[in-house]
Amino acid sequence: MILKNNFMRTVLLFIGFALINSVTLSSCGGGSDDPPPPNEANLAVTTDPANETVQPPALGPYNLKVTITSAMPPNGVKIEVSAKKDDGSNTVFFSTSVNRTTAVSDFSITGTPAATQCLVETKVTSLTKPTNVWSGSYRYSSK
């Protein structure tokens, strides 16, 4: 009789332990329910004036057209444009940053110093996938 009671007690303790563990472990979860990052084509961009070119000296206006030629990311893009003297001084005289959902964006670079070669840098970043970035530059001179 004592042996039977010890056996039953052991079985009941085992079942209780198993139930507690199953409830505890099932609430641990398997990780985050965050969706995977969106699958997005690399940004492809053209500029006018073209990337990596040197424009002849001109009086202005100094316009820049940025065209997204790849599929537009679902949340759009951030376009950053800056212009500075091309003398190593890093003094920026024009800077803008805009968010866009359209493929074509026009900019007018202002504040260009006279008789100076300038460097325009353009950076386009996906607002959906911030690691998806395109960068380019061109040079122009004012008369």
Walk through the language-model features, giving the residues of each.
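Juxtamembrane/interface motifs at transmembrane-helix termini
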Residues: 96-97, 139
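Aromatic sugar-binding surface patches on proteins
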Residues: 99-107
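Bacterial Sec-dependent N-terminal signal peptides
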Residues: 2-5, 10-12, 18-48
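Surface-exposed, short loops/turns at beta-strand junctions within beta-sandwich domains
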Residues: 109-117
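Short beta-strand edge segments in extracellular beta-sheet folds
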Residues: 137-143
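Short coil/turn motifs at beta-sheet boundaries
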Residues: 38, 57-59, 115
